[in-house]
């Protein structure tokens, strides 16, 4: 991490350039250029649906965590997304221009290389995340339940070495060509992968109680923070966005104990949800004005 103070600014507007980014007053080519400059782990009510929602939300969680650890991964992901979009466009165009079919192999080769690289990064990170989150879940459940998370990818189902992932994805794309042409989009690749979260070796999504699902998410987010701190050599900022009221008292206590000594920002609508805090500053918003005090909150304020 860079030790000198930096100022990042993102401007949201209208027109052709909807977002503009600056770092220390210098214009950046894209907002994505700021990735890795300010590292934070966000925990919001949306994340509580991480286990029970569809695969896209879990992929988004995984990719966001990896982008902060490795800004180069963000560029890899962007390249894959552009290549995927181009292949999908070609699949649709082929139905009207059959002579384009012979160009599909070029995109298969490019997509398989990028997809294999993404799969390797995700797989390696998930192995470490599962171990770290498992230890945290063990603490939340007081050793009563076993937690695990693993990467569910078409490239991994038959085993094999990482060196063979590119060739395997290329084969999947080739063999699935008819299906892709009928569908008009690419049906194989890391953009279709998922994370399988289990408690007691059963799917937390299908069989977990609401409490178990929330414990899983809490374990995953805290593990994300721990692994990011390890990679950076310093603790990232923790942002708890209106999530405290969604957790019961025991999970609130566990979360707050785990992040003692970290820089933490907590937003809430109910001041009572952070009444157990004994230190720090409280900022509150009233009629568009922001001020701060020391954990003495006005009623019905947004913190």
Q: Across the structure, where does each feature detected by a protein language model lie?
A:
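Conserved NTPase motor "head" modules and their coupling/switch loops across ABC/AAA+ ATPases, GTPases
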Residues: 97-237, 246-250, 254-257, 263, ...
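Walker B catalytic acidic pair
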Residues: 242-243
């Amino acid at each position: 991490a860079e030790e000198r103070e930096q100022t990042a600014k993102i401007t949201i507007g209208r027109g052709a350039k909807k977002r503009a980014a600056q770092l220390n007053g210098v214009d950046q080519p894209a907002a994505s250029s700021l990735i890795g400059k300010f590292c934070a782990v966000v925990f919001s009510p949306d994340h509580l649906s991480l286990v029970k929602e569809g695969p896209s939300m879990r992929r988004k969680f995984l990719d966001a965590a990896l982008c902060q650890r490795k800004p180069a991964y963000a560029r890899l992901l962007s390249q894959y997304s552009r290549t995927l979009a181009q292949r999908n466009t070609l699949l649709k165009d082929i139905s009207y221009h059959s002579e384009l079919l012979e160009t599909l192999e070029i995109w298969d080769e490019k997509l398989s290389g990028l997809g294999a690289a993404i799969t390797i990064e995700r797989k390696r990170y998930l192995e470490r995340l599962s171990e770290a989150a498992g230890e945290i879940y063990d603490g939340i459940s007081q050793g009563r339940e076993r937690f695990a998370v693993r990467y569910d990818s078409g490239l991994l189902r038959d085993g094999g070495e990482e060196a063979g992932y590119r060739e395997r994805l290329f084969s999947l794309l080739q063999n699935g060509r008819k299906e892709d042409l009928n569908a008009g989009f690419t049906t194989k690749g890391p953009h279709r992968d998922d994370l399988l979260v289990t408690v007691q070796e059963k799917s937390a999504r299908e069989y977990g109680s609401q409490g178990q699902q929330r414990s899983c998410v809490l374990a995953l987010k805290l593990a994300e923070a721990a692994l990011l701190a390890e990679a950076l050599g310093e603790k990232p900022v923790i942002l708890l966005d209106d999530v405290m009221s969604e957790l019961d008292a025991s999970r609130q206590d566990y979360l707050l104990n785990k992040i003692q000594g970290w820089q933490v920002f907590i937003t809430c609508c109910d001041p009572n949800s952070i009444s157990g805090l004994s230190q720090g500053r409280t900022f509150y918003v009233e009629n568009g004005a922001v001020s701060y005090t020391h954990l003495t909150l006005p009623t019905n304020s947004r913190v």
